[in-house]
């Protein structure tokens, strides 16, 4: 029995080290411009917080590998419109409920440029980059799409493409959850890239009808996490190989999307979408990430009260916890 226990212990230690080694090569940028406090709805914070918790606790990305650029960053001024237009609140900087600030950077053009420059200096051809964008996009007077950053700054698709072009990485996966997301695809697609969009170029993206999140990206994050914001399990591993690929997450989100929008996905090479997951490229890395202990989240006073799989979200300007 001792021998068996020893083998199991060493196996768990190996799997934990392997998972850490894989996640060491994944980096993420979460961008939510907000535009202004009149336009920065609570659900955008919820979208980002759910994904942040998923990347940290389900995908095991190191905290320092996740860069958050959201509305006015850690400025304590009110920057977020409460649900039902019931006044304004300041976006919480703690996205995972551990009592420590996670958000520091405002979603400005300068901060985004500096972030991409820093990543260019850090990342290598053995690394993978994930970029997630929610909030507002629009079309200008000439019909061209633009992304709204904080304080009414605009970012054109070609400008975002120019920021990404110097990167020398193994692959880049991009998820765009904003309106007119499809208009960004011609600028962002390319070799070694996956681009997922919540809607077509001429469409709006929509909020969930029954929860304070955006519809497509909510279901996409559920697929990656393999549970919803309350911790209820979802089945997104279509081929039951232990990985959630970008294709599987996209398919799951499409099936569960209830709004009048047309999600899209493009990948070069095409099979990259089936291979790419936060556990590595699945036909290169053959082992599965194994974790027997779920991380514990904390309340705002640092007390260990609930699992990270239970939903921390904002409604009416107040942090709330959905218990199973």
Identify the role of each PLM range.
Residues 86, 90-107, 122-124, 134-167:
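A short, glycine/acidic-enriched catalytic loop
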Residues 312-324:
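C-terminal tail/sorting-segment detector
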Residues 172-266:
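Active-site-proximal C-terminal subdomain of hydrolase catalytic domains
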Residues 16-127, 279:
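Boundary/activation segment at the start of structured domains
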Residues 33-42, 97-106, 145-151, 206-210, ...:
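Second-shell loop/turn segments in exported
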Residues 281-301:
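Residue-level detector of functionally pivotal "anchor" positions at catalytic/ligand-binding pockets or at interdomain
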Residues 34-38, 72-76, 135-141, 153-154, ...:
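Solvent-exposed loop/turn segments at secondary-structure junctions
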């Amino acid at each position: 029995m001792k021998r068996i226990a020893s083998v199991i212990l060493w196996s768990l230690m190996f799997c934990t080290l392997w998972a850490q080694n894989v996640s060491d090569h994944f980096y993420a940028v979460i961008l939510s411009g907000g535009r202004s406090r009149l336009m920065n709805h609570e659900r955008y914070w919820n979208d980002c917080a759910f994904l942040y918790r998923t990347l940290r606790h389900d995908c095991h990305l190191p905290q320092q590998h996740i860069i958050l650029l959201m509305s006015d960053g850690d400025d304590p001024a009110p920057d977020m419109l409460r649900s039902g237009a019931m006044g304004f609140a300041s976006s919480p900087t703690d996205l995972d409920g551990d009592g420590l600030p996670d958000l520091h950077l405002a979603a400005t053009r300068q901060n985004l440029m500096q972030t991409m420059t820093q990543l260019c200096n850090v990342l290598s051809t053995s690394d993978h980059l994930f970029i997630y964008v929610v909030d507002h996009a629009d079309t200008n007077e000439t019909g061209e799409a633009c992304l709204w950053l904080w304080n009414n700054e605009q970012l054109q698709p070609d400008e975002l493409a120019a920021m990404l072009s110097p990167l020398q990485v193994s692959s880049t996966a991009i998820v765009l959850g904003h309106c007119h997301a499809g208009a960004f695809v011609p600028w962002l697609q390319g070799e070694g890239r996956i681009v997922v969009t919540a809607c077509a170029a001429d469409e709006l993206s929509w909020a969930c009808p029954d929860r304070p999140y955006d519809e497509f990206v909510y279901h996409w994050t559920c697929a990656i996490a393999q549970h919803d914001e309350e911790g209820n399990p979802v089945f997104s591993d279509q081929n039951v190989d232990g990985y959630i690929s970008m294709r599987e997450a996209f398919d799951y989100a499409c099936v569960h999307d209830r709004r009048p929008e047309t999600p899209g996905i493009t990948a070069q090479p095409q099979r990259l979408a089936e291979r790419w997951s936060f556990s590595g490229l699945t036909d290169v890395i053959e082992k599965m990430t194994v974790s027997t202990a779920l991380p514990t989240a904390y309340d705002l006073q640092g007390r260990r009260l609930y699992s990270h799989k239970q939903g921390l979200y904002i409604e009416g300007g107040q942090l709330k916890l959905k218990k199973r």
